[in-house]
Amino acid sequence: MEFATGSRSEEETLERRSFLGALAGASLGVLSEATFIEFARAQNTEQARATLVDQVSFDTSQVEVSGNTIFLRRYGKGPAILLVHGFPRTSLMWRFLAPKLAENHTVICVDLRAYGRSGIPASTDDHLPYSKRAMAKELVEVMDKLGFPTFTLIGHDRGGRVSYRLALDHPKKVERLAVFDVIPILEAWSRSDARFAQTYWPWILLSQKASLPESYLIGAPKAVFDNPFGHGSFSGEILEEYVSTYRDPARVHGICEEYRAAATIDVEHDRADKEASKRIECPMLHLWAEGGPLDTFYAKDSGPLGIWRQWAPHAHGQAMKGGHFFPEENPDDTGVLVKQFLSV
């Protein structure tokens, strides 16, 4: 069987359990906007938002592709949008944005290989199975099996890098591309310095030879979420769902392999495309964190958008409030801009 589907599954149960705690004793019923704002101030923002998204139905699937299994969450009906998370999150990071986009689209949120509930393919000495090229090809297979030969593609962090690679390697598959808070791998490494290394520490630490970085992550799986790089305003139960990935040594090794690929073979793939003047020709939206590293590191390059326009001539975008994880921390503004992008 290609994939097994379960409606309102264990993952939704996790969300419901976390969300309903916010409602206990409140007798909220249907929230007006004013009531929601007041409630958000009085309770955890995660819980308050949840009262509005908890009624949105979604299914979960395990899709078998080329010897691996990809876990996904599916919302809505209509033209397809594929959402791809980054480090250190899973598909759960889209829990607020996905329902907004599902009003007139089918929204597919995947766990990348090794993350969350997806499979963990064996790696090789050249890290090719965890290259962005291999991961992108896998996602194309997923969408083909789901019956979506073309789709809008949105990626954040590592998922953004898988997404732009997919758009370069499979241009006929991607109708529109949105990449959140990253620049191309080659461009990031070519501009790296001490400030880069201190800010983007996972690039440096996790790309080291096995098993040094694996030992650090497994030894303190919650540490990354206490760091500004991974911190968020989510509830304890959502945090526990994220952290569970880093308690599994096989998953941690797979994640480190992806970072090793980003320091080696992914750079080669980017360089080959740049030297061949290969470009992303579909419409592209780039959003980045206001006041974050992309907003401050690359001013001399006309900002991150200036860098992206060397790769995607139709790119446009802006800075966003909410930090690196603005799709999760500021889903309202993110949703407005993505919907505008989809309507053009």
Residue ranges and their predicted role:
Residues 1-14, 41:
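N-terminal secretory signal peptides
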Residues 97-105:
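A short, Lys/Arg-enriched amphipathic alpha-helix followed by its capping loop at the start of a domain
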Residues 87-96:
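The serine-hydrolase catalytic nucleophile loop
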Residues 15-23, 27-31:
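N-terminal export leaders
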Residues 36-43:
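Signal peptide processing junction and immediate N-terminal pro/mature segment
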Residues 79-85:
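Short beta-strand element of the alpha/beta-hydrolase
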Residues 44-59, 68-70, 80, 93, ...:
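Flexible "cap/lid" subdomain of the alpha/beta-hydrolase fold that forms the substrate-access gate
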